[in-house]
Structure formats: structure tokens, C-alpha cells
């Protein structure tokens, strides 16, 4: 055989193969053809109920745009197609037919629309699909894909189908799943191993493989709710450890068993429905979930049902529930909140579409109120009284009853006045009692109408759900007459007069009318406000007179040539009512003011003085103002000159004619207005020692012009102040030297039996500060008292204790000296002339012994004492009757 293929023919075969490959490589690529990968796609779904978000399948499209993604549009809004071609369910739906179809559209690079049809088929339901799968009659073997060039990665398109393993199997374990073989196991000894989740990654050891035979086994029961899919990698190596095959991916899917019952999302569901709801009205929805597989099995296909209803009124089946969605709706009519306000339902959820595991929950349905009961007045007639001219006065409280639920729109009352043409009344609703409060919105006029009859209806905030009649109440309102204030007509009253209107003249008559036509009342008038004091009013007639001169230029009281005064009118009703009227006097201008310059004080520099602008002001109105005429008078034109600054002659320019001496200058300026009203004004101008514009100017004091300097003035003032201080000190010294003389005799109105004078009528001495020097002087410096009718007896003089230095010993001092005085042998008897130790020093009055009118011992006549009054009656009795004895 070898020689047969030798030589030239043998070399020609590789050349032909090379040419064939080269020709294939040189061929131009086929043009891109846009379109879907198939004309139609069919996807099988395991159940008729499809939840939101479920993935149905995938379509492919080549748009020849070079973009990795494509925009798809489904003509069935229940499905959504993503840019990757994956079709998902947009909202929950139920397949009522075994098969449905729809179109999916896409556009190519030329904006041409292309379509494909997608069909959905429901899988056939087997009642015992949840039981364990029957044992296989033939062993399943997985073989590594063949490789022509040794070890290389397997093709991306080559996928090993997943291996199914039921959950919750009973064993025995380990249990064979599948046998893995290599195509080279007949050539060399191959050893097998696995890696991945469940093998060498947590949970470790769930799956094992026999090293030599390649049997993949499960070692324990699986739980789909924990891990639904395992991904393992099988490896084949030779005895020396070299890889014989590329690693192969093995997917183990845990098939579901119905081992979880449904669970409601809530133990108690709350819902509500209005009374009188029609059958088919949706009330609420209950939901339950199931942890089992809801894609490939019916273990999580939940069906809902109602087990019980409480109460069974008015029917035992008032509600129904959708088996698939759990929506509870009204089944029959007859819902009445006033009869049954609440229903309690026990609902059940069962998987396997109602044939499997079950659970229950409670649904509480509240029957809400509707406006099927009208508000009714009770009573229907009312009477009220209101004084006239008063707004927002409560007239009556309208009572209503309503059988609907309180504090709801079906209970809240709304009142309407049928014959309220002028909107004089309003009815508001009390938020607590629901009563209607009838009030006035504006003042009523008794003279216009004395009684009103109102018709009031009542409804609710929400309209009636059924045809109902409305309730009506009748309210009679009587208007009470009250004393109303007089009304000035017109108000305000405008009167135009000249400002030089004569004093005492009548300006106008401003009177008021009494609206109380049924009362004959007398009205008097007074001035209420007259800020300038220009007016007076006749209290009976209301005539307005001037009592002072008017002045339009009194800008404090006159605004825009108008003077405002308030006049009041007072009636004699009970109570007294007062009305106010406004009188506006428009004062026309009179040329009674001469023009004046502004400013009047100015400073000029002596050198190169800057002229000053003087504005001319006239408070009068045109034509009594500009143009003005200016003139310098009293010799002011010798040093100064003026000229007009503007054509209207409303300002002047003042400047000196020559260089002036420093000092004050008085300039007399005569200004005349357009109507020849003139006025002379003196300008005070000071010439400063400066040049050009005056920045600062020091004015010389008046005394400086008299030749007196500031130091001299201060010296004179200081001398006067020193002289005043010296005189004040002398006066204080003289007052301190003056001795206060004590009175010798008591006051004339003090009559006593002896000559002792204590200056007190009882109660003790208030002043406890004793003048101890007087006591000492009274004992040691007694005055000399001589008698000329008795020869003195020479006796020893008692020794008196000197005044102590310590004031605390004053008591002992007085007691000892008193005892010495009592034992004094020189003391005269009580019936003779007493010699007092002390009667006051420096007294200008003589001693009592000076009463003798003669130096002889002859008897004296004392009868004249009786003529001296009661003060000398005691002396007259003592001396006047001596001869009778």
C-alpha cells in the first residue's frame, strides 16, 4: 500500500488541500441578511397562571446594524421583550386557552420592520407528578467530548443536559446518579474526580465520585428550598496525574417535592365595602405564598376559597373569592351598615391548585356608610329677634337628626336659605353638634323692614345615594328698633373759601338727618376736632362760623390747601347716639406772604471770595410768587452786589464788590413777588480770613471787638467768684459765734403756783442727750443773789461733787449733789425768798427780786396786780391782803 501512494502523486495531495483551503479563504464573505433566527418560536409553560416577571424564552434577531442589542416590540401588552430578546410576563395573567400567540417586531439597519410569531403552550398536568420519579431501566452515562488534538477547551456550544435529583429522597445513601466515562479509558487507566459546590466547596461531601469507575453519587437527602441547583466539574486524569480530558461541567437540578404548605402574608386581612354595593364589586384581596417550585411543578399553584362567613345575614353567601387571584368581591345584594356593619370570613389557600396542602387566614370586611338617610329638622319652626344695625348676631339654633354615621360626610349637614335675596343672613354648621347657627351677615334696618320669614333647607356634604326628600324649616326674625346715630349728608362736605375769610362770618351749614323716623328727636351740633381752633358751630342750626383768621400757609394743619374738621351731631334718644361728619375747607390762596431768602447766614473768604446762591421762597401759590424782584437797601449795595441766577428769578447770586475787612456784615435785601408784595430781610454775612471757598471760619466773639481779651475776662470772673466765697465764709462764721439766749420767763399762757418751769407737761424727756456742762455750771458758778433786808449768816458751805468725766456716772453725780443741797444750812426756809442755784446765764431779764419798786423796807401796794388779769391773780392774793392779817 505504501508504494502505491509514493512518488509525485503522494506529494500532490497536500498541495490540493492547500489550494482548496486558500480558495476558501479568498472567497468574499456572505452579505449580512437581517431577520429573526426562526419564523416562529414555541415556548411551553408548566401552568396556566403566569405571574409577573416570569421568563418565557428568548428570540434572536440579526439587524445588520453592528450593535450588540436590538429593540423589540410585542403586539401583546401583557408581555415584554428585552433588548437581549428575553420575553417576560409584564403582569399576572391566566391562560384560558391551551395555546396563545403574539408577534414580536424588530427593525433592521434600513428601518425595515421584521416580525416573528411566539406561541405559548400550557404543559399537560399529571396528578402524580409530585411523587418520586420511577426508577430508570437503563443506566445513564456521561462521556467526555472527544478531542482530536489532545487536551483543549470544549466548545462553547456544547452543553451537558442537567441531571435531575429529587429532594427529600429516603435513600439508601450513597445513591448513584450518573456514571462518567472517558473515551480513552480503554487506552489508559483513567481516574475521576469532581470539584465545585457540594463536592469540595460548601456544602462539602454532598456529592462524591468513585475514582476508578466514575460513578457520581449523592450522599444525603437534598432540599430544593435551600439549594435548587448544583454546578460540578468532573476531571479525568491518568495514573501519572496528567489530564486526560478537559474538565466537564455537570449541572444537578434538585426537583421539587410538595413539602411546603402555602403561607398567607397576613393573619388578618382588613377590607371595606360600601353598603348597598352591587354584585361583582371588588372588596379586597388576600395573598399567600408557597416556597415550592412554581415554574416546573404545581406544588406552588395556590387556589383560594372561602370556608365560613359570620354572620350569615342577610345571606349565607354574601361574598365570593377568585380562586387564582384571591380577590374577594360582593356576590349578592343586601349589604346594609345599619343591619350588619361587619363580616368575618375564614379564607383558605391550597397548593396543587386546591388539591394539596392548605392554610387559613381571616378576612374582616367593614360595611361603610353611604348617604341613605336624610337630615331632618326637629322642630321645623323657629322664632328669633335681632337688634337693627348689628351684624354677626346669632338669631336661632336649628336642630337636625341624621341616622348616618356621625362625623362622616354622609352625616355632616349643609344648610341653605331659600329666600336670602340680599345675603343678609347665613347658616353655619356647628362642627360638634351638626346644628345650624343662623346669624346676620349685615345690619338690618328697622325702618326698612320689621320682620323677615326665612325658609331653610338641609342636605349632607355628600349627595344622597338614593332618592330622598329634603327637610325644610321656617324661621321668623323680628327686627328690634334701636336709637341710630344721625347721619351727615353729604359726608364729607367740601367748601371752598379764601384764606382771608372774615372772622365771625358763616362759612356753611352742615346738618345731619336722624334715620329713626318713628322717633321725634332733637339734634344738636358740636365741633369734635378743630386742630387749628378756627371754627365754631351753632349747636341748634349746625351753621359753621370762623372764630379766628384762616391761614392756608399753616402747613401743620393745612394739607394740600385743605383744612379738615370733624363735626358731631348728638340726638336726645336713649341711649344718646352720635354721628360724625367731615368738613373739608379748601382755602384759596391770598397774597399775604412776602418772599424770603434762603439761606440767611453765609460766610465769604476775604480773598477771591466764592459767590453764594440765594434761593427765594414764597409760601403763596402762583401768580403770587415768581418772578421775583430783588434790591439791596440801607447802603448794602456799597459793598455787595446781587444778580438773578435763572430766568424765573427764583434765585440770586450774592458776592462782594471789593475786598472787605474781616468781620460781620448785615445786608438788607428787599424781595418783591409778582403781585408787588415785598419784604425786607437781613442777611448775616461774615468775612473770613481765607481764600476762595470757605472751609472753616472762626467768628470773633463780640467782646473781642471791645478790646477785652479772653484772659482778662476770665480774670474778672475769677475775682468776682472769690469775693462771693469770702462773703459766704464770713456769714457762716458770724452765725457760729451768735449765742442763743434762753428765755427767763415761761410763755404768757403758762400759769403756775411757783416760778419753776420744766418745759414739759408729762411723758418724760424725749431728748436723752444731756448738756453736762450746764449741770456743772449750775453748781460751781452760781450767780450772786443778795438780800438787803436780812443779814447773812456765816455758815460752812457744803462740798458739791464735781461733774464726772464718765457720762455713765451721771446718776450717782445727781444723787450725791441733791443730798448735799438738802443738807445745805445756808438754804432759806420754804416761806422765804428762795435763792436758786441756776436760772440761766446771760439772760437780759432781771431776777424776781427786781419786782421791788423801792430799796426801802416800806410796805408796797400790790392791788394793781388785780388789774393785770388771771396770770397775776396768785401774786395779788399773796401780797394784796397782807394788811388784814
Curated annotation (Swiss-Prot):
Origin species: Canis lupus familiaris (Dog)
Give the protein's recorded name: Cadherin-1
Q: Where in the cell?
A: Cell junction, Adherens junction; Cell membrane; Endosome; Golgi apparatus, trans-Golgi network
One biological-process term from Gene Ontology? calcium-dependent cell-cell adhesion via plasma membrane cell adhesion molecules
Signal peptide location in the record? 1-26
- List the transmembrane segments: 713-733
**Record note on domains:** Three calcium ions are usually bound at the interface of each cadherin domain and strengthen the connections, imparting a strong curvature to the full-length ectodomain.
Residue intervals on the Cytoplasmic side:
734-885
Q: Where is the composition biased (Basic residues)?
A: 121-131
Amino acid at each position: 500500500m505504501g508504494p502505491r501512494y509514493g512518488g509525485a502523486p503522494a506529494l500532490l495531495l497536500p498541495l490540493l488541500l492547500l489550494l482548496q483551503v486558500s480558495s476558501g479563504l479568498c472567497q468574499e464573505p456572505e452579505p449580512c441578511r437581517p431577520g429573526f433566527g426562526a419564523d416562529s418560536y414555541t415556548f411551553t409553560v408548566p401552568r396556566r397562571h403566569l405571574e409577573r416577571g416570569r421568563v418565557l424564552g428568548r428570540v434572536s434577531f440579526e439587524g445588520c446594524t453592528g450593535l450588540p442589542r436590538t429593540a423589540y416590540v410585542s403586539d401583546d401588552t401583557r408581555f415584554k421583550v428585552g433588548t437581549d430578546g428575553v420575553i417576560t410576563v409584564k403582569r399576572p395573567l391566566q391562560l384560558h386557552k391551551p395555546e396563545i400567540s403574539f408577534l414580536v417586531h424588530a427593525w433592521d439597519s434600513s428601518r425595515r420592520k421584521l416580525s416573528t410569531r411566539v406561541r405559548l403552550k400550557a404543559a399537560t398536568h399529571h396528578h402524580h407528578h409530585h411523587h418520586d420519579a420511577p426508577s430508570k431501566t437503563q443506566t445513564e452515562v456521561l462521556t467526555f467530548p472527544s478531542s482530536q488534538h489532545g487536551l483543549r477547551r470544549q466548545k462553547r456550544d456544547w452543553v451537558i443536559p442537567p441531571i435531575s435529583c429529587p429532594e427529600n429522597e429516603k435513600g439508601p445513601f450513597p445513591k448513584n446518579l450518573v456514571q462518567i466515562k472517558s473515551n480513552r479509558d480503554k487506552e489508559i487507566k483513567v481516574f475521576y474526580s469532581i470539584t465545585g459546590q457540594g463536592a469540595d466547596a460548601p456544602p462539602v461531601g454532598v456529592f462524591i465520585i468513585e475514582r476508578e469507575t466514575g460513578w457520581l453519587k449523592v450522599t444525603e437527602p437534598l432540599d430544593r428550598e435551600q439549594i435548587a441547583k448544583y454546578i460540578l466539574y468532573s476531571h479525568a486524569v491518568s495514573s501519572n496525574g496528567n489530564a486526560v480530558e478537559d474538565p466537564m461541567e455537570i449541572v444537578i437540578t434538585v426537583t421539587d417535592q410538595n413539602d411546603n404548605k402555602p403561607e398567607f402574608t397576613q393573619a388578618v386581612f382588613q377590607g371595606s365595602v360600601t353598603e348597598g354595593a352591587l354584585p361583582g364589586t371588588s372588596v379586597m384581596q388576600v395573598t399567600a405564598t408557597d416556597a415550592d417550585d412554581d415554574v416546573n411543578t404545581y406544588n406552588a399553584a395556590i387556589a383560594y376559597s372561602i370556608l365560613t362567613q359570620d354572620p350569615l345575614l342577610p345571606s349565607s353567601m354574601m361574598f365570593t373569592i377568585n380562586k387564582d387571584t384571591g380577590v374577594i368581591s360582593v356576590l349578592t345584594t343586601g349589604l346594609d351598615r345599619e343591619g350588619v356593619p361587619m363580616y368575618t370570613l375564614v379564607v383558605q389557600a391550597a397548593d396543587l391548585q386546591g388539591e394539596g396542602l392548605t392554610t387559613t387566614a381571616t378576612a374582616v370586611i367593614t360595611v361603610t356608610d353611604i348617604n341613605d338617610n336624610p337630615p331632618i329638622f326637629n322642630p321645623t319652626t323657629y322664632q328669633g329677634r335681632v337688634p337693627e344695625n348689628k351684624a354677626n348676631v346669632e338669631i336661632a339654633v336649628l336642630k337636625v337628626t341624621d341616622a348616618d354615621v356621625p362625623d362622616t360626610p354622609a352625616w355632616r349637614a349643609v344648610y341653605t336659605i331659600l329666600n336670602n335675596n340680599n345675603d343678609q343672613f347665613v347658616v353655619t354648621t356647628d362642627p360638634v353638634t351638626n346644628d345650624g347657627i343662623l346669624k346676620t351677615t349685615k345690619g338690618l334696618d328697622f325702618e326698612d323692614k320689621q320682620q323677615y320669614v326665612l325658609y331653610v333647607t338641609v342636605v349632607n356634604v355628600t349627595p344622597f345615594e338614593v332618592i330622598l326628600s329634603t327637610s325644610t324649616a321656617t324661621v321668623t326674625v323680628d327686627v328690634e328698633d334701636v336709637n341710630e346715630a344721625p347721619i351727615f349728608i353729604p359726608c364729607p362736605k367740601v367748601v371752598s373759601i379764601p384764606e382771608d375769610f372774615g372772622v365771625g362770618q358763616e362759612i356753611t351749614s352742615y346738618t345731619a338727618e336722624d334715620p329713626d323716623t318713628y322717633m321725634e328727636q332733637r339734634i344738636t351740633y358740636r365741633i369734635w376736632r378743630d386742630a387749628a381752633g378756627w371754627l365754631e358751630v351753632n349747636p341748634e342750626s349746625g351753621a359753621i362760623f370762623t372764630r379766628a383768621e384762616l391761614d392756608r400757609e399753616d402747613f401743620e394743619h393745612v394739607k394740600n390747601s385743605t383744612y379738615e374738621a370733624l363735626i358731631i351731631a348728638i340726638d336726645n334718644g336713649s341711649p344718646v347716639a352720635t354721628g360724625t361728619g367731615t368738613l373739608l375747607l379748601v382755602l384759596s390762596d391770598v397774597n399775604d406772604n412776602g418772599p424770603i431768602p434762603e439761606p440767611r447766614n453765609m460766610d465769604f473768604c476775604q480773598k477771591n471770595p466764592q459767590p453764594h446762591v440765594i434761593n427765594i421762597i414764597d409760601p403763596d401759590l402762583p401768580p403770587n410768587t415768581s418772578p421775583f424782584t430783588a434790591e439791596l437797601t440801607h447802603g448794602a449795595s456799597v459793598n455787595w452786589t446781587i444778580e438773578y441766577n435763572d430766568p424765573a428769578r427764583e434765585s440770586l447770586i450774592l458776592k462782594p464788590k471789593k475786598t472787605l475787612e474781616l468781620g460781620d456784615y448785615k445786608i438788607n435785601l428787599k424781595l418783591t413777588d409778582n403781585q408787588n408784595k415785598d419784604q425786607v430781610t437781613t442777611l448775616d454775612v461774615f468775612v473770613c480770613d481765607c481764600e476762595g471757598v470757605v472751609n472753616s471760619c472762626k467768628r470773633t466773639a463780640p467782646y473781642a471787638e471791645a478790646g477785652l481779651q479772653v484772659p482778662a475776662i476770665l480774670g474778672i470772673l475769677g475775682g468776682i467768684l472769690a469775693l462771693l466765697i469770702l462773703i459766704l465764709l464770713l456769714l457762716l462764721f458770724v452765725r457760729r459765734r451768735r449765742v442763743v439766749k434762753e428765755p427767763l420767763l415761761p410763755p404768757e399762757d403758762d400759769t403756775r403756783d411757783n416760778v419753776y418751769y420744766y418745759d414739759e407737761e408729762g411723758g418724760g424727756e424725749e431728748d436723752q442727750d444731756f448738756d453736762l456742762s450746764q449741770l456743772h455750771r449750775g453748781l460751781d458758778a452760781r450767780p450772786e443773789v443778795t438780800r438787803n433786808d436780812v443779814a447773812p449768816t456765816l455758815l460752812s458751805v457744803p462740798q458739791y461733787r464735781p461733774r464726772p468725766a464718765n457720762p455713765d456716772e451721771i446718776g450717782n453725780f445727781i444723787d450725791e449733789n441733791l443730798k448735799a443741797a438738802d443738807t445745805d444750812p445756808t438754804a432759806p426756809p420754804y416761806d422765804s425768798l428762795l435763792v436758786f442755784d441756776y436760772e440761766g446765764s446771760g439772760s437780759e431779764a432781771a431776777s424776781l427780786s427786781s419786782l421791788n419798786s423801792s430799796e426801802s423796807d416800806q410796805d408796797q401796794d400790790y392791788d394793781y396786780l388785780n388789774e393785770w388779769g388771771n396770770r397775776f391773780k396768785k401774786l395779788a392774793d399773796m401780797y394784796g391782803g397782807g394788811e388784814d392779817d
